[in-house]
UniProtKB/Swiss-Prot annotation:
Coiled coil: none annotated. CDD domains: TMPK (cd01672). Phosphorylation of dTMP to form dTDP in both de novo and salvage pathways of dTTP synthesis. GO terms for molecular function: ATP binding; dTMP kinase activity. Its EC number is 2.7.4.9. It comes from the Bacteria. InterPro entries: P-loop_NTPase, Thymidylate_kin-like_dom, Thymidylate_kin_CS, Thymidylate_kinase. GO terms for biological process: dTDP biosynthetic process; dTTP biosynthetic process; dUDP biosynthetic process. This is Thymidylate kinase.
Amino acid sequence: MPGRFITLEGGEGVGKSTQAKALAAALRARGLDVVETREPGGSDGAEAIRRLLLEGAADRWNARAEALLFAAARADHVARTIRPAIEAGRWVVCDRFLDSSIAYQGGADGLGDEAIRTLHAIGSAGYLPDRTLLLDMPVFDAAFRQAEAGIANSDRFEKRDEAFHDRVADSFRRIAAQEPARIRTINAQGSPQEVTARLIEALADLLP
């Protein structure tokens, strides 16, 4: 049975981390061998870069520096964690991947898609997921969810202003419209169980 690479994407507060864990558990319940990972991070080198990217003031890095750091972390992550797992026939569920760089640095911060994809081609040979699940909900509702959970403004990106997060959401929707074969947009509102069921449904054609 071939391994599969599944990514979860979306803006701040849409529930990616919660749903990545729930999706991995649901896939294991179906008898699949699943690796859970995240970006930035997922390998020793990438986790070190994660700390550089997420800690500190919102303006610690400019968009170009961020894009380079993300690409470096991703290159190590793909080489050391993702590709070996896929080649061993395992399923990989990853909280964020390339599309986040396109939406955040490429779209919201104005570097453009081409620059981000060029870095990805250099660092990770253009490696792409088998399926990307984009969790989508209004930015205001996502921010309210974070505030209720007491996790608002916990890293550099969450500290950015509302206009930035609106641009991120718009960029994700644009990317999804451009790549409908790979990306499925999932309504992130409702109970966690309802959202997980939508994720599983969006993977139906890949499941054994």
